[in-house]
């Protein structure tokens, strides 16, 4: 049975975004609308939501009917959104980088190893599909992608098995790919499904998720108002590292000064962020018990000070 969509780290997101009446917020990853709806319900504010997945438009229309002019939706990838936002500025920006339950549970989207369907994995439906990639990529490229984006220690073994399998049969379904991976590794008691890391790796690669996160962060300063907050929920160590490093590189490191020092320290204009979360927040055991898909989530938040 499909799992209903449960927004991850919802309370932590609201606490760090701190929505207020009359303010404007940007939900960069609308999905099933969990974050947008929660922010709209928290106060009398306004939301612009983004998503490149055309399948979420119906859900966006439902929220629009309920909240009217307080809600606006733009069908676009967040990394390409700046021109479409037309110089709007926001009091807060939130990104939930995980694939939504809605995408995972629809077999035809090709994201899930639990539901057999066409091997697609494209969030926008455009560009190279997972089926095309696994059937044309060289063995070394397959291994590198699975290792880099999935942190899969058996990546070479899996890549070799994929290449052997496709010599006689095209890999055109999620079920076939999942079985190839499982047969390469074998099930280990008490561990996650062996196909988890490989599917994650191919999805991240196909959708250029890390590159688009970096591209968005490089421009987010331009759409945040002074004191505006940036909240990012990630599900992969590489995503979290990108966000962590971005916050660190753009924030002022606290300086220990003598109480006798009289001169003021000039503010570095390149250090425009103040980190709110000293370290990444993780999901509680209670939340993971209710939603196993939240187990790897991490939240970081920062505020624009210049």
From Swiss-Prot:
Q: What's one GO MF term for it? A: rRNA (cytosine-N4-)-methyltransferase activity
Catalytic function, reaction form: cytidine(1402) in 16S rRNA + S-adenosyl-L-methionine = N(4)-methylcytidine(1402) in 16S rRNA + S-adenosyl-L-homocysteine + H(+)
Task: Give the keywords, sorted.
Answer: Cytoplasm, Methyltransferase, rRNA processing, S-adenosyl-L-methionine, Transferase
Annotated coiled-coil positions are none
Q: Where does the UniProt annotation locate this protein?
A: Cytoplasm
Which biological process annotations from GO are given for this protein? rRNA base methylation
Cellular-component GO terms for this entry: cytoplasm
Q: What is its EC number?
A: 2.1.1.199
For the ligand (S-adenosyl-L-methionine), the binding residues are 33-35, 51, 78, 96, 103
The regions listed as transmembrane in this protein's record are none
**Does the record bear Cell membrane in its keywords?**
no
Name the InterPro entries for this protein.
RsmH, SAM-dep_MeTrfase_MraW_recog, SAM-dependent_MTases_sf
- Family to which this protein belongs: Belongs to the methyltransferase superfamily. RsmH family.
Q: Which HAMAP family match?
A: 16SrRNA_methyltr_H (MF_01007)
Q: Its biological function?
A: Specifically methylates the N4 position of cytidine in position 1402 (C1402) of 16S rRNA.
Q: What is this protein called?
A: Ribosomal RNA small subunit methyltransferase H
UniProt gene name: rsmH
